[in-house]
Amino acid sequence: MATSTMILGGTGLLGFHTAQALLEAGGEVTSVSTESNNPASWYPSQARLHKGDVFTMSSERLEELFAGHDSVVYALGPDDRVTPPAPASAFFQERLVETSVRAVAAAKASGVKRVVVFGSYFTYFDRTEPERGLAARHPYMAARVEQQERCLALASDDFSVAVLEIPYVFGLVPERNPLWADVLVPRLDLMRPWIFFPPGGTAMTSAGYVGRVARSVIEQEITGPLPVAEQNMEWKQFLTIASEELYGAARRVITVPGQLVAGYGVGQQLALRIKGLDSGLRYRDYLANVQAKKSFIPESVIDELGSRLGLQPGSVEPAIRKTFAECRAISERPRRKSEPS
């Protein structure tokens, strides 16, 4: 199926790989972003580039922008790394919920037939394990749940809306530092000779797989929440692979009880409060009850989505290795902009 798709946030990690997947299938792509780093020099030449800030656009401007396209991919953040001025709930309400709902509604009004929203796998766990109370505890997760509910509510018989529930992602974008260079590498650099980390693990995927999933969802006009993952991996295995690429040899990973790690979260939260900042995650609870647990998506669910979309989930290890090999390489050249949400 040849499609004409507008990707909001098309120069980010997931937007870039989605553009590649759509172009490989013969589709037309227009990318919208605030990118100022001359994306024409590295973005796929077949795609059209449009500079604009979706967060400040009116519904009318969005409708004008979407006109003539049959599909829209909403690949904008922010994600849970952002620590805005307190209260975090107000920030995520505006930047995650209201902006995405405004964009999806504008897409429907402009005649677009298919929308894919990139969400978070926290909504999957909030839905399947309600006893954990994730949305009730964490403003970021609450915003993701509301984003999903309100975007899906706009779907109709002739307008499909899918929300991809995306876990940890690995991959590269030209002219960008991997987000992991800022998020994880500095922490690992401080832990020598061993790495101390809580138990548990996470579902994960490659950016390329997310792009292919988005393409297939558009082609099949699917509506609903879709948990996207390729495999589950415990932190110990993940950190062994990452440290091997970062330091040339795997470091020993020592497991620290989750409740002990939670004490570190109290200090993090206090440091933010002193600065007048807030996190969308309540660090103490997050470290003890999320990061220290196995946030795994069942293999049956992973395989079911792959079969439904005609895709084959693969090993994420090659993407992890490429990502952290790049993290190691960036120390040898001038610093570039890190991958945005």
Label every PLM stretch briefly.
Residues 5-25:
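N-terminal Rossmann NAD(P)H-binding glycine-rich loop of SDR-like oxidoreductase domains
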Residues 8, 32, 75, 115-121, ...:
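SDR active-site strand-loop-helix element
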Residues 47-98:
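NAD(P)H-binding glycine-rich loop region in Rossmannoid oxidoreductase-like domains
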Residues 98-143, 162:
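Conserved Rossmann-fold NAD(P)-dependent oxidoreductase catalytic core, especially the SDR/UDP-sugar
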Residues 131-224, 229-231:
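Oxidoreductase cofactor-interface core, primarily capturing Rossmann-like NAD(P)-dependent enzymes
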Residues 199-208, 226-245, 258-265, 314:
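Substrate-binding strand-loop-helix patch
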Residues 240-295:
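Terminal hydrophobic/aromatic helix or amphipathic segment near a protein terminus
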Residues 295-341:
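Amphipathic terminal alpha-helices
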